[in-house]
Amino acid sequence: MTQKFPRLFLILLAVLFILNLVQGYFTELIYDEAYYWYYAQNLDWGYFDHPPMVAFLIKLSSFLFDGELGVRFMSCVLSVGTYLILWELIDNPKKKDYVIHFFLLLFSMTLMNAYGFLTLPDTPLLFFTALFLLLYKRFLNNPTIWTSIFMGVVMAALMYSKYHAVLVILFVFLSNLKLIKDRNAWLAVAVALVCYSPHFLWLYQNDFVSIKYHLYERPNQAYSFTKFTLGYFVNLVAIFGLLFYWVYLSLIKTKSTNKFTKALLYLTYGVVIFFFISSFNRRVQTQWVIIISIPTAILAFNHLIENANSRKWMYRMGIVSMIVLIYARMWLVHSPLLPIIFETHGNKQWVSELNSKAGDIPIIFENSYRSAPMYEFYSGNSTFSLNNHMYRKNQYSIDDSEERVRHKKIVYVTKYRKSGDITYTYPDGTVFYGVFMNDFESYRKLECIVEEPHEKSTYTLKVYNPYEFDIPLEELKYTVAYSNKYKQVKEMIPLKVKPESSSEIILKSKDTLFFQFELPKPKMENHGYFRIGIAENGLLPGLNGKPVKLKE
């Protein structure tokens, strides 16, 4: 072991592992972690927003620990694994002389640092990207059947981590088009497809909900150079912190001397260019480009080994980065260290305040898939995120969580109220109000399907009831939400629908009723889409229909 990994390397790796464990234990969850913890309460082959790997890791962690570490333990393990694999991917024999430089380089990469203890889909994405590159490198040197099989399994694991993983596989393939004639490469693809088939089946059974949301239904906004394209370049700087100059310098200086280096360059440039083009359509989130951290770490470390000037400055700035990031990690635990409130601050406090007033009564959070799992994690009580026309669908829209609150006394929390039976305060000072409701009932899974008008402006509306019980039509009120071309809701109007059969008073279980309607004229100009929603029992209308593009 010490022949491959120097003693100093193993010592620093152990220190890093302990640091991440301590950090993971004392840092409160961020909202996305709470949401993925909610995933893990019911393991499945897929979820609304992401493939299931993050939920699987959280489930494994929960077998070993309770609390925050029960969410994060496997992230700490995978982080160590990523460091080990990256070290193995460095061929330069002089690397043993620069162990400290190696750790400073990786520790300075801000998001890689954070994903050393936070559990998000990008955590396994980083690990399996590194492992995929290691297997691909071995495949280039010795393309055996077993290497192909293992590579196929890892390709599937990549895709189970996050859909962005397709970019890793695509750009590595583009760097070596001869793979298309390599039967061992096709074996890897076949193994990957077989391993990934349960998720394909889940997508099919759930009407490809994840793909449709990410590609078509996700709201956008008007293009802004500052927010979109310039913001993207800021993100490219932010992921490498103070070492960004030397990381990109190493990328520019590296020449494609072999197929593996060519793969690293194609992967890095490919992802950067892909999201640069995407930035003209929508805002690119920082973590979307995190996968370039793996190939650039290899390129940057090889560069610093051979370039004394870069090595000197990367070492100096790496120490500064380490100090800054350690202080930032302390601030994640202890908020007074900086005058900024972050997601890891005060969650236990607001949950405790709300729980003291609501007791064991389930809480329904309107339009908040973030607050609902956070409250459930720290209180242990049932929650539900009720989504309406001003929000978006999420995991609560497709699972059975609605049944946990049906016909029960609940507390309904919404940011739209200015008074209520109880209040609680978020760490940022925002006051939320909640009201008690008896015998709560919602029908958020009713489906509204709009058919194109055959004559003039009359549309056909099909309303499908997926529930195991019948629903009285008198409880349902219809609305149409108009949105701009970016799918941002701007106006909502009550909708009059006419049933095809006037004798129908019940929407039976697993049945569909047909209605006719004419679109009311909106006040807004430049409308792009409309969406039909159903308001039941006095609630705001839901997301029962899909956005329908209006013809000009």
What label would you give each PLM region?
Residues 42, 135, 146-162, 174, ...:
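Membrane-interface alpha helices of multi-pass inner-membrane proteins
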Residues 157, 167-261, 276:
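Transmembrane-lumen/periplasm boundary regions of multi-pass, lipid-linked membrane glycan transferases
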